[in-house]
Amino acid sequence: MKRMKNIRLGTLVACMCVLWGCEKPNVNIVMPQEASNRVLFAGEHLKKALEDAGYSSVMLSDTAGMDKDEVCIRLEQAADTAGLKKEGFTISTRGNMTTVTGNDGSGVIYGCRELIDHVGQYKDLKFPAQLTDAPEMVLRGGCVGCLLYTS
């Protein structure tokens, strides 16, 4: 009887260790304090999607005090837009730091959508080391349909 109790206790401890080790990391979403409404929207949309996927996340205005091992996603608009088309974005990842740089606020939104799609498809935070994308046509989604029907 005592042996059976020890086996149950050992199994319980092993299960707790496995579950504790499987905890998803906290994700810090960092954006400038003076971020535009579109960048704020992108950050909130990303935060909700991460939480829906089981991650805890927090929105910050800088990386001060963050541990270098914490996962961080930085959202920003490009200061120099020469390399990006309108509504374009670049995602770059080094270690635990992923930066989404949009040519404009819409580019940041589309970059965050790319991250959200990645989390949904791959169930992880291993984002591409480098990805740049921009639309062929600036108008996307429902706007194109509206233009077709209002002409």
Segments from the language model and where they lie:
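N-terminal segment of the mature soluble domain
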Residues: G43-D62
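Short, well-ordered secondary-structure micro-motifs within conserved domains or adaptor modules
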Residues: V58-L84
